[in-house]
Amino acid sequence: MEWITALKKAIDFMEANLCNDISADDVAKEVCISSFYLQKGFAIVTGFSLMEYVRNRRLYNAAQDILKNEEKIIDIAYKYCYETPESFTKAFSRFHGITPREVCKNPSSIKTFVPLKITISIKGGFTMDKLE
């Protein structure tokens, strides 16, 4: 259960810091596990690397922000830690399949990537008596 707690804590930390420049080492320090083991365990359980998860969540949230139409695309790019608008547009297009400017015209094209929730369900482990 210690691993599950660590993974949940890692997810919470990443979610709280989507608008901050964080690294896998920052996440590992937060949960007190070596970066190597955390990255390996996270990838095994979720199918994503730590930073792939962060990137996907940022790009999903960025699309939601663009739909609200309250901020300029360049400001959203910087908000989610992209160094240039071009790098943001490239990552956004790869993830969503459309450019940030096309989002309002075609909101159904946005790829959904909601926060991970880790739950464990253990079933079985008991014997059944034979009915006679």
Protein language model annotation of sequence segments:
Residues K8-D25, I44-Y80, P107-F126:
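Terminal helix-turn-helix DNA-binding modules in bacterial transcription factors
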Residues M1-T5, K90-E132:
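…primarily DNA-binding HTH/wHTH and HhH modules…
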Residues S34-S35, E83-T84:
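Short coil turns linking two alpha-helices in DNA-binding domains
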Residues V31, Y80-C81:
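Core residues of bacterial helix-turn-helix
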Residues L38, F42, S87-F88, F92:
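Short hydrophobic/aromatic patch on the recognition helix
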Residues M1, I33, A43-T46:
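N-terminal intrinsically disordered/low-complexity leader segments
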